[in-house]
Design a protein with these regions (language model features):
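Single, function-defining residue in the core of a domain
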Residues: 1-55, 63, 71-72, 76-84, ...
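Intrinsically disordered, low-complexity basic tails/linkers immediately adjacent to helix-turn-helix/homeobox/MYB/SANT
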Residues: 97-110
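Short Lys/Arg-enriched helix C-cap and helix-to-coil transition segments
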Residues: 88-99
Length: 292
């Protein structure tokens, strides 16, 4: 175990050094930023960010610099932080993860990749419309980001993340984007009812992935309610849907399912006269005494 910890730690240090050796790619003004010698240089800044927990920034700085009397001020740190692009940490996450992604644990040869999202409360700022979310139960203003993530369930590691602001928050779009940019093969995508979406199904199929996504029951207003399903309490059937953007007598007689123009489906542009065939399996089974 100690060898593995040292290996992972050394890998992280190497990727931080690689990042620090090419800072111009991740600075707002590469010709000026971090050009002067400061106690918080680019590599030190990355180290502070990676080591920070939930304490105040002044406490984090004191911890990082071992309570040195010449510890840089919060203002100095904030000035350096303003120079760095978010892409620096995206690069570090992806390069480090790709280098340390385990391949040993799988389910019948497949990676189990779970997708979910969560709100992250950040510092209150009434002047930031992109992150202004809502008023909380106490009537206070709340600013949030939304974190979308892919998590390798059996290997217990995040494989991708996508952060959205309140203004552009869309879990369907985030999931489809992470599917498209993934390099992983032999994947079973696992998600809850929040990801019940034909566009996600199609992206997974086009990627060559399998998926197991929970959907609302057939008596609700979800996808299952619009399908011709057996009356049985339990069933396991294959479904094929042919989608069309056109809602004409011809398409209706052909049995095509109309895809409204306000519904995002990347494989059928809004004015397309083509069709798209989507096949999947739907299973209904009990998960409680009176629920399926």
């Amino acid at each position: 175990m100690s060898n593995y910890i040292n290996q992972v730690s050394d890998s992280l240090k190497n990727h931080i050094s690689e990042l620090a050796n090419n800072p111009c790619l991740f600075l707002r003004n590469p010709n000026v930023n971090f050009s002067r010698k400061r106690k918080i240089d680019f590599k030190t800044f990355i180290g502070i960010m990676m080591n920070s927990g939930g304490a105040t920034m002044s406490k984090e700085l004191l911890d990082f610099f071992d309570f040195d009397k010449n510890t840089p001020s919060v203002s100095a740190f904030t000035q350096q932080r303003s120079k760095v692009l978010p892409e620096a940490f995206e690069y570090l996450f992806k390069s480090f993860t790709d280098d340390n992604l385990p391949t040993t644990n799988n389910y019948h040869g497949y990676r189990l990749i779970a997708c979910d999202g969560s709100n992250l409360t950040i510092a209150t700022n009434q002047k930031d419309p992109e992150t202004f979310w809502e008023r909380n139960q106490h009537g206070s203003i709340v600013n949030k980001l939304h974190l979308n993530a892919f998590y390798d369930v059996l290997n217990r590691i995040y494989t991708d993340v996508l952060v959205q602001t309140a203004a552009d928050y869309n879990e369907f779009r985030a999931c489809a984007t992470m599917i498209d940019r993934s390099k992983l093969e032999n994947v079973i995508l696992v998600a809850d009812r929040g990801y019940e979406n034909y566009n996600i199904f199609a992206h997974a199929i086009e990627k060559g992935w399998k998926f197991a996504i929970r959907v609302k029951d057939k008596n609700s207003n979800g996808i299952a309610s619009g399908l011709n399903l057996p009356p049985n309490d339990e069933f396991d059937i294959d479904i094929t849907q042919i989608f069309s953007r056109e809602n004409t007598k011809t398409t209706k007689n052909a049995g095509y399912k109309w895809m409204p123009v306000n519904q995002v489906f990347d494989y059928l542009p809004r004015k397309s006269d083509k069709t798209y065939e989507l096949s999947f399996r739907i299973i209904r089974f009990p998960i409680g005494s009176n629920s399926y």
